[in-house]
Amino acid sequence: MKKIHRTLSLFTVAAMCTALLCSCGEVPDSSQTDSSSKAATTTTADTTADTTTTGEASSTASVTSAPDSSVSDSSSAVTDDTKTNGITPAMWKVTSPEGSTMVMLGSFHALKDECYPLPQAVTNAYNNADILAVECDITSTSEDGEYMKNLMKQMLYNDNTKLSQHISEEAYSALQTYLGYWGMDISALEVYRPWAVSSTLDTLLIQDSGFDSEKGLDNYLLTTAHADGKEIYEVESVDFQMNLLINFSDDIYDLMFRSYEGETKESQKQALEDLYTAWKSGDIETFLEEDNEEELAGYTEEDKKIAEDYNNQMLYDRNKNMAKAAEDLMSQGKNVFYVVGAAHYAGEGGIIDLLEKDGYTAERVQY
């Protein structure tokens, strides 16, 4: 069994929305944070909130060699300047029973400069596709002022209650201790709903660990696709992902916050770095390694049910829909580059497993 999978909440839209809200001033008072967390918040707003595309569509355009939102060149076309950086993310060529094919890639939603230029195999898969399929197109939402205004309202309690009334004393205490490592006081978060607190902490963790959501693989490919005029297919939507976060029960967030017990800023950064290292080598199974009995110590039977519910909603239920979307696209003969989070492909109940059970074959791409 797997404990509640906090790292699965680190998908692009959560960080993007928190970053936009930071830029709008809708985050805890910066006086409650130390210099490092102030810097992280500022960086998040600067690098993630202004996700724009540049250049005109070109029939010869291709994936750029490195993500740079400041580029204003009239074309996104580049050379195939591939460096040897050891980045070999998991990628498959999937073939349907009827013989149609699709290239599928496992993404990591926040990356570092060292990941670019992309490996040639990834560049080729993008350039050869007519359609880029992603979880959701966050670049279109970042400029929607009305959407962000409504989202900001949902961050806050509007019934005169506060965070401490919605989670247990144990969860509150664990969260308070963990916030201390970030130089934050929990009192600054009392008016925020649990999903907003969680997303804010995720964003701080991403930035303080040296990652950049704007350089995340999906965001980079989306920006490039818009510049190239390439068709984009949303497997889900921003609304779907945000509603998923917003509608998780207080019990789920209570368990999530209790999981901070014994954690520090450094331990969380190391956990994220371990996942990143696994992603770079194409080791997707690391994302879903089972916890041993020692790691599950302290989990009641009710906790295990809550964790299972969360993991099903965040991962396995979505995997089914993602696999179905891939099958639909292949049945239409679409030439698609299919890019969703790496964890969605892993293990039993992952996209590859589901496709193989439906008679599809999946061949791992070798770099």
Please report, for each region that a protein language model flagged, where it lies by residue.
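Phosphate-group recognition and catalysis centered on beta-loop-alpha active-site segments
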Residues: 31-32, 38, 60, 71-77, ...
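Bacterial lipoprotein signal-peptidase II cleavage site
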Residues: 22-33, 37-49
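Structured, acidic catalytic/metal-binding patches in enzyme active sites
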Residues: 79-80, 90-310, 314
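Extracellular/periplasmic catalytic domains that process cell-envelope and extracellular macromolecules
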Residues: 85, 96-97, 330-332
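N-terminal low-complexity, Pro/Thr/Ser-rich intrinsically disordered segments
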Residues: 52-94
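A generic local structural motif
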Residues: 2-4, 89-90, 118-120, 323-324
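Sec-dependent N-terminal signal peptides of Gram-positive bacterial secreted proteins and lipoproteins
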Residues: 3-28
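A cross-kingdom marker for long, charged
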Residues: 303-367
